[in-house]
Amino acid sequence: AQSGIWQTVWLERVPDNYITELTVTPDYDARTVTVKAHTAQPGGAKNLWAVVRAGGVTIAEDWGGDEADQDGEVTLNIPEEHFFPWSPDSPFLYDLTVGTTQGDEDGFDTVHSYFALRKWSCEPDAKGILRFCLNGKPILLNGLLDQGYWPEGLYTPPSDAAVVHELEQVKELGFNLLRKHAKIEPQRWYYHCDKLGLIVWQDMVNGGGKMNQWYVTYLTNALLPLLRHTPDAKPLWGLLGRETEASRESYQTELKATVEALRCHPCIGCWVPFNEGWGQFDARAATAALRALDDTRLIDEASGWYDQGGGDVDSRHNYFYPLRIRPGGRTVALSEYGGIAWPMPGHEPPGKTYGYGTAKDKADLTKRYKMLQWKTILPQLGRGLSALVYTQLTDVEDEVNGLFTYDRAALKPEAAAVRSCNAALAAEFAKVTAK
């Protein structure tokens, strides 16, 4: 457990009429960006202006605002010659400067931000199988589960440099995705993902009361093929920890706050409202709320179980059963798998050593990892598997199934083997989705 200040805190001198918030909405198809400024004083954004730069060159600028509204809005067109879509291979960010003024120094404020042009969709490949598409092209989303714990500060990393180093290592191994598991990171973490071209699937934070661990975790895992589609209706809410109206209202409030806080980060490609039934209730309503807040991203309505058939993702967790992918009306993701444990000598985290099968040493872990990728994952790509999330990025307290040790000092399997597997998966996916 930990206590104290969470997230970033700073002091800043601002004018009386300062910009409190920006809402930046890029439109990939229209090649525009709409900027809305919220200000401290009524009518404070009536003389809103915005400038877009690409590589230091001004490519668009405009004025806007509304005399009767404190929230001004401008839409800027991106010229054809400066249209640079964002992707993991080319994470181009446009610089954005926004200002407001009421004609005097006290009413003047300027902020600097950025945005990207990119588009998520689910579209059929040449065989009619739905695939995740980025900017209209099929993309294999290949990533790691990231719980975001650090030995030095649990939720808090030791430094910004440590965060960047970890994210760079993920990219160097050939992954393009992190599933941020039940944690909201400081904005700077997402900024680095934006810059590096790492896609993020963002879980909502767990909540509610005490759930029935025996039912939600043990029984459902044991009988997953039978219970995966259990309705999350009112009779189940007590078992899932959502019996009280207050806890359900709290979830809805936090869902909205999470989207509003993170929606301007281009790295986020998918919202995950529920994971493995933890605090789940009325998942279809959560999806509808997310669509109303942000219709530019994918939604993994219920990661693992209890699947209500909504959202964009047929989301599977599989640690124990033979993997059989059958394409249907949603795009298929293996949103948790693997989890091979090995407590690396000299780097063991405190507590128990939990995982899904235990390797004997580095060579055995590498062998098991390669076999899993080549024998289990690769054959399923042609059958519709379009995203995969290995458990997990690092060891954490009580869990030793990370690719990296908890102290981030060592990669447990051989790096060359991980890179080779990822390259093979990417090549196979390109082959099976080619038109």
Functional labels for PLM-detected ranges:
Residues 167-168, 177-409, 413-422, 430, ...:
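Substrate-binding/catalytic cleft of secreted carbohydrate-active enzymes
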Residues 1-192, 196-200, 254, 269-270, ...:
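Secreted/periplasmic carbohydrate-active enzymes, especially glycoside hydrolases
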